[in-house]
Amino acid sequence: MPANIPRSDYAAMYGPTTGDRVRLADTDLIIEVERDLTGPYGEEVKFGGGKVIRDGMGQAQTTRAGGAVDTVITNALILDWTGIYKADVGLKDGRIHAIGKAGNPDTQPNVTIIVGPGTEVIAGEGRILTAGGFDSHIHYICPQQIEDALHSGLTTMLGGGTGPAHGTLATTCTPGAWHLGRMMQAADAFPMNLAFAGKGNASLPAAIEEQVNAGACALKLHEDWGTTPAAIDCCLGVADAMDVQVMIHTDTLNESGFVEHTVKAMKGRTIHAFHTEGAGGGHAPDIIKICGEEFVLPSSTNPTRPFTVNTIEEHLDMLMVCHHLDKSIPEDVAFAESRIRRETIAAEDILHDMGAFSIIASDSQAMGRVGEVIIRTWQTADKMKKQRGRLSEETGENDNFRVRRYVAKYTINPAIAHGIAHEIGSIEVGKRADLVLWNPAFFGVKPEMVLMGGTIACAQMGDPNASIPTPQPVYSRPMWGAYGRSVEHSAVTFVSEAAQAAGIGKTLGLAKQTLAVKGTRGIGKSALKLNTATPEIEVHPETYEVRANGELLTCQPAEELPLAQRYFLF
């Protein structure tokens, strides 16, 4: 017969249930379980000696062909833009097969995920499950970035480059069909979904079209190549015709026009605006204004996330290196100083909290840290809770809405912007099983396990020579999904529809599956999730003060952050 047990005992056995609250690492962010799909109480499944998932109990006789899943993640606390709730998650063929209640339908009620003899179990009790992160601003300077990204909880990377060439050190472009081919062939080796952007800086369409046909699934306009109104207009025209996204780094020096001229050249066409605050580059001092445009999908790069007492100082040296500038040339120094403004960086914090900035990415090794996208997102959320208090949208004694808003910034929103939300970006049935499992005490900092296409690619692991997996040193190590031909079947390469239709995978002899992006055009900020605000932004030309709908946006820099030195003693 069922027996009543204390709520604390239940949470220790099966993880938190409806109404329980969980602190995210050492932040002030508190989430509350909204609902629990694993019940009824007393029918939960759990693996282990004397536990439920045994033959004839929680494990049915069902074959894989008969409907049993490949893997079940039991009793996980899902943290997603769609909600914060508890469920079992069934994986099959590398995708999310079902979300609900796992078990044996012959002996248990309400089973929606069949556990069979061919089913593996990942214990999600007391763990948080998120969708894998998507970093949409990558300079492919060195392949070692991928390891750092994966072990931080990222499962998809989009950007451009060919290695430490000077064009790549500054701009996110893989220019030309030949380079695109070499990079896609290299992508076969890595346990990471990869996607490549071509160079969009051209005033005539032929060379841009050539890159999209060669596999570029996005196009990058960068000021170092000349982001003129003519180039903007031409690039967006090709993008509209071929359904790829355009990312833009605008003209810091205002040589070919001001922000108003850039907006005019866009003609209301969808565009992903990189580092929209401006420290990473863009019309000085007021590029931040474009986050109020519906057709602009605004993102931040992570060095300005959040605003701290060290942000300004580190940016000047960072910028000189990244853009091949010379400290002995006064004009180069002036260029650098024009981009770093404490007023706009402070406003950026608040615009994220309002949902006016929609995406956070890294700008890897080119004024950004590839392994800190997730950390800095949650540091920003924590800083804003401390400084601004609860959001008006919150209900109950929790931060669920704020947490859902911020997780969307590195999962579903970049996926929508780049036409791959049908494949990744959230925990929903049918999407790829690119998932991250977290110990709540280490949430946002050090994943416990990362799955690529349903296969464990990395995990916290102890001494391989020990008699059990837990003895020190415990740290994140590559797992079976990161080796051999498993890599080819666990991760994918995203390409344009034109390249997919032409059989780019066969042409280049690619081992990984290629998937086409779609639906990147004609969308606006309103298509993004929980980050749709379009305030009217004004920037004072002399003081750089930022106002949104007339309200001054300012905040103090943080002197101390969570998710920092406490987690990185070694």
From Swiss-Prot:
Its main location: cytoplasm. GO terms for biological process: urea catabolic process. It comes from Ruegeria sp. (strain TM1040) (Silicibacter sp.). Substrate binds at H222. Its EC number is 3.5.1.5. It catalyses: urea + 2 H2O + H(+) = hydrogencarbonate + 2 NH4(+). The active site is at H323 (proton donor). The keyword Membrane does not apply. Binds 2 nickel ions per subunit. Belongs to the metallo-dependent hydrolases superfamily. Urease alpha subunit family. Ni(2+) 2 binds at K220, H249, H275. Its cofactor is Ni cation. The modification N6-carboxylysine is found at K220. Residues 132-570 form the Urease domain. It is an enzyme of class 3 (hydrolase). InterPro entries: Amidohydro-rel (IPR006680), Metal-dep_hydrolase_composite (IPR011059), Metal_Hydrolase (IPR032466), Urease_alpha_N_dom (IPR011612), Urease_alpha_subunit (IPR050112), Urease_AS (IPR017950), Urease_asu (IPR005848), Urease_asu_c (IPR017951). It is found in: Cytoplasm. NCBIfam families: PRK13206.1, PRK13207.1, urease_alph. Heterotrimer of UreA (gamma), UreB (beta) and UreC (alpha) subunits. Three heterotrimers associate to form the active enzyme. This is Urease subunit alpha. One of its GO terms (cellular component) is cytoplasm. Carboxylation allows a single lysine to coordinate two nickel ions. Pathway: Nitrogen metabolism; urea degradation; CO(2) and NH(3) from urea (urease route): step 1/1. Ni(2+) 1 binds at H137, H139, K220, D363. The keyword Lipid metabolism does not apply.
